[in-house]
């Protein structure tokens, strides 16, 4: 944890705009200088930057008065170009090449696309390019929307196997209470476990950039073995102090001891389950306590249509999700063999069949003791 090489930096809209909400060349230049400083110290930097819609409002003032989704997407389309102009001009001062990557949730849910994106990042990083990432708001309807750049930055950090995620914000870190409301609020410097208490402090999941989304981002990366630091964006030399000088800045979220491997992490946090498989108490016990694979005999009910190789949710009979996994059977096959033992399955499908619906190597539990 003392020598972070690959760093994902996320910056929010308020951290790169002025008091009127327009992009601030001064603030963006300060951020660019910091990123270049890390690059020249032989670090690898990926920047996740908000600010496209704000940049669009600066240009399209009439359109900015509209509140509908097409207007927001149009503002984002115009603003993303403007935002990248800022970055291109300012990084070019230091002769630092950059690239633009726009993502949707679907790009990360699909395993092949996810791997391809990871490889693209790798190539850019190898070539000493700073990838600048944003959500592709222009095409991101609700079903394929990541929703906020805190979550996006966490998923990018996992996709590229980063050593550290730094979220720069307008707050110093996570406080014990809302510092705007309570004089007794204390900055929490170290968080080793994101439990109910921490989630309660973060508040309800409203909005697209509050403390809740930052804690959820921390949950995603720490489960992948990646630490996260939440710090104030306008702190002078903040990235240098965190990465190069190893100063204690903001709130540090430490990775969990038994973190998920990349494949299982993708299943739990990236993939969209294509169906639901309900299991009996015996199968639940075998998964949770004995680390076994899921067999057809333990399956009670199936919902949704899915094909072999899809990710599905595994639920107990109360409807609580206990895990996710990659299925060896499509939904129609599983419907025929659910609750059946090996001999019965042989009579239905013949000799060529899988013993497991989901092999333990392709299964991840929500509350894990084994993964």
UniProtKB/Swiss-Prot annotation:
Binding, ATP: 10, 169-170, 208-214
BP GO annotations: L-proline biosynthetic process
Keyword terms of this UniProt record: Amino-acid biosynthesis, ATP-binding, Cytoplasm, Kinase, Nucleotide-binding, Proline biosynthesis, Transferase
InterPro entries: AceGlu_kinase-like_sf (IPR036393), Asp/Glu/Uridylate_kinase (IPR001048), G5K_ProB (IPR041739), Glu/AcGlu_kinase (IPR001057), Glu_5kinase (IPR011529), Glu_5kinase/COase_Synthase (IPR005715), PUA (IPR002478), PUA-like_sf (IPR015947)
Primary site of residence: cytoplasm
Transmembrane residue ranges: none
Protein family membership: Belongs to the glutamate 5-kinase family.
This protein's name: Glutamate 5-kinase
Gene: proB
């Amino acid at each position: 944890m003392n020598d972070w090489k690959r760093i994902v930096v996320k910056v929010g809209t308020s951290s790169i705009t002025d008091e009127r909400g327009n992009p601030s060349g001064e603030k963006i230049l300060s951020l660019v200088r910091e990123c270049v400083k890390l690059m020249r110290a032989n670090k690898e930097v990926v920047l996740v930057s908000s600010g496209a819609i704000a940049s669009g409002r600066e240009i399209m003032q009439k359109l900015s008065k509209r509140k509908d989704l097409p207007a927001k997407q149009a503002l984002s389309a115009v603003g993303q170009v403007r935002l990248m102009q800022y970055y291109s001009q300012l990084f070019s001062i230091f002769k630092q090449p950059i690239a633009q990557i726009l993502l949707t949730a679907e790009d990360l849910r699909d395993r092949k696309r996810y791997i391809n994106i990871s490889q693209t990042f790798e190539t850019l990083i190898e070539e000493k390019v700073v990838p600048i990432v944003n959500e592709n708001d222009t095409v991101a309807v609700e079903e394929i929307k990541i929703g906020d750049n805190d979550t996006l930055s966490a998923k990018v950090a996992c996709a590229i196997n980063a050593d550290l995620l730094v979220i720069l914000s307008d707050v110093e870190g996570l406080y014990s209470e809302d510092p705007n409301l309570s004089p007794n609020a204390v900055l929490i410097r170290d968080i080793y476990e994101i439990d109910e208490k921490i989630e309660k402090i973060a508040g309800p999941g409203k909005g697209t950039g509050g403390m809740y989304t930052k804690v959820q981002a921390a949950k995603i990366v720490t489960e992948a073995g990646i630490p996260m630091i939440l710090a104030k964006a306008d702190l002078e030399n903040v990235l240098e102090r965190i990465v190069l000088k190893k100063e204690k800045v903001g709130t540090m979220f430490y990775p969990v001891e038994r973190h998920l491997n990349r494949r299982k992490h993708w299943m739990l946090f990236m993939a969209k389950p294509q169906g639901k498989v309900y299991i009996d108490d015996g199968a639940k016990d075998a998964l949770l306590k004995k680390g076994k694979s899921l067999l057809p005999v333990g399956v009670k009910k199936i919902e949704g249509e899915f094909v072999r190789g899809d990710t599905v949710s595994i639920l107990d009979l109360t409807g609580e999700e206990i895990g996710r996994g990659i299925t060896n059977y499509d939904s129609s096959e599983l419907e025929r063999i659910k609750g059946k033992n090996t001999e019965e399955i042989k009579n239905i499908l013949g000799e060529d069949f899988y013993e497991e619906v989901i092999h333990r190597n392709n299964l991840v539990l929500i509350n894990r003791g084994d993964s």
